[in-house]
Amino acid sequence: MSSPSITAPGAAQPPSAPAQAPSAASGAPKPGFAPLTGSQLVLGTVALSLATFMNVLDTSIANVSIPAISGDMGVSPAQGTWVITSFAVANAISVPLTGWLTQRFGQVRLFTASVLLFVIASWLCGLAPNMPMLIFFRVLQGLVAGPMIPLSQTLLLASYPAAKAGTAMAMWAMTVLVAPVAGPLLGGWITDNIAWPWIFYINIPVGLVAAGLTWSIYRSRDPGPKRVPLDRVGLVLLVLFVGAMQIMIDKGKELDWFNSGQIVTLAVVAVVSFLFFLAWELTDKQPIVDLRLFARRNFVLGTLSLSIAYGLFFGNVVLLPLWLQQYMGYTATWAGLATAPVGILAIVLSPWVGKNVGKIDPRKLATVAFVGFGGVLWMRSHFNTQADFMTILIPTVLQGAAMAFFFIPLQAIVFSGLTPDRMPAASGLSNFVRITAGAVGTSLFTTLWESRAALHHAQLSESVNRGNATATQALNQLAASGYTPEQALASVNRLLDQQAYTLAVTDVFYLSAVLFFALLVLLWAARPKLGAAAGGGGAH
């Protein structure tokens, strides 16, 4: 995550801008936390990457298992979706609290405790005897997961010398981007071949290894806790605002959005509590969330660019396998095989991006990502029902190149000019906005897909009548094959559904491509300084 005008949190000052490294008085870490070397560096990187991958994986691994979970628990699939919603709501609430929690408990203590509690919550999820208990344990899992991603970023960057901070950020970014793609594939395979509780049990060995390695390597590098007051009013308002907003986002499509009194109520609660939250946090002496970060040009523009782009990316990550499985006849495994190769070019190119992000304007690198994503989505906008596996695979592979240029330069812009003491708060806040944007993108895109499919279905249905020679011939052929009139019409309707949902998904792909190109305007409004820091111990 190094970049012009960036310093990775906790890393040493960049050689490119020694004059800009903050002094101890400015909040820089106390001397003594030199970069890790040798086996400690390797094991530390593995531990932090495992924890991050495990965390992000859990945001999507349960998605394809909802039918199995609902069936076992004796509830409807709609009720089963609370397994996803409960985690998302709790996680969204706890992520922006990372800054305060870090001051109160210390980085390493908080991270290690979060991982261990995540393991315990995962174990309890697998043991849950009924849906209310499973939802409760998912809430617990989401709450303790919040600090893991921001702190893994901070600790990882503090482990590397400034010259290699970009490479460290590249590895971190890959876990965040690849895990949501791997989640549905892994979750589907486990559910089909073992049992759904194992989508939670697999976290236990991974988490124990990650926590053990992290504590053994990093415990002596923790600056320790500070006595800071708890902003109770801010916390209550945050819970109300984020909780209502996240439930509204997750349940909006299911409840028909603002035609539902429940959604309207949630929207009112979210807006009112958000306004009170803003007023309180901007005037409180010890705010639980440092909203003053949004006064910084690079932070706000970088966060918006990253979050909107992530919302577009994540919404399409969810939509593509849904279309493949529901309307193209793909199994969960084959849909996974069609989307998994996205990591190939990303893994190949990310080290180069990390190495050069401090030498090249991060806006130029991020432009490659936005143009790449836009080009891939434009290719997908030409899909049809005859698209074969290779036609679907090629854009997926190319998307990996865009992913390599995505996180690293954008986070370089986000953290540009920040001192190390503000890094945990900045990382938590930017990750909160990004995660929320991912949820919004998923909800809006699935809703748009359904509405466009209904429109296309209505238009296509107009041509299915006895006055249309092609439709008449198809119905006659079905009748000659022994279909009753009702069966023939049902068969034709399935074909219309396939065409309608395919046209609708290409509409979404096209819109996403346009939005990625439009985001370039927002990106280039940022002003990172080339040659400023690239690590975390300097002015991030």
Model-identified regions with their sequence ranges:
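Hydrophobic transmembrane architecture of multi-pass small-molecule transporters
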Residues: P9-P18, S23-K30, A34, Q79, ...
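Glycine/proline-centered helix-kink
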Residues: P150, M171, V176, P180-G188, ...
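Membrane-embedded alpha-helical segments of multi-pass transporters/permeases
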Residues: W123-L127, A211-S216, L275-A279, W378-S381, ...
